[in-house]
């Protein structure tokens, strides 16, 4: 049986509260470019706001002026969204904690071995992550290629998780292959 081959994420749509809250958070805090707004064609009581998270793809938000923010945490059950992660530069990552603190937004920071992560919630309890890789992907190589290679190196070494040495070795191997160099 043939599979259906996807080519990436097209968009992610969230249920938000009202327009102003969505604009304040997605554009005001996260700096996403507001693209346009139109009625939600599936529900005449909602508007549909479109934002660019920085890579040309779409984050969209359904809003309704009668809804108010509800920061209650979302259930972490099977079939529910755990969180959405957005890529940020190293320079931005170093400023995130201070900027969230200035707005009174609680957060938690984690070192994930191959990336640094900061987690916080939107005004409606959706958990978000701002992530920054600990490597710069070489030209002609994808982030996923570096991570898969680093994981193979980690496993061969019997290490618990990917660390910066595994990343450095993976990048060296991938660039050697890309450039046709011999060791």
What are these language model-derived features?
Residues 1-14:
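Short, extreme N-terminal leader segments that mark the start of a protein/domain
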Residues 7, 16-20, 77-79, 83-127, ...:
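Vicinal oxygen chelate
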Residues 45, 67-72:
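A short, acidic/glycine-rich surface segment
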Residues 54-58, 66-67, 91-93:
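Short, charged/polar surface micro-motifs in flexible loops or helix N-caps
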Residues 58-61, 129-130:
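Short glycine-/small-residue motifs
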Residues 143-153:
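Low-complexity, intrinsically disordered terminal/linker segments enriched in charged
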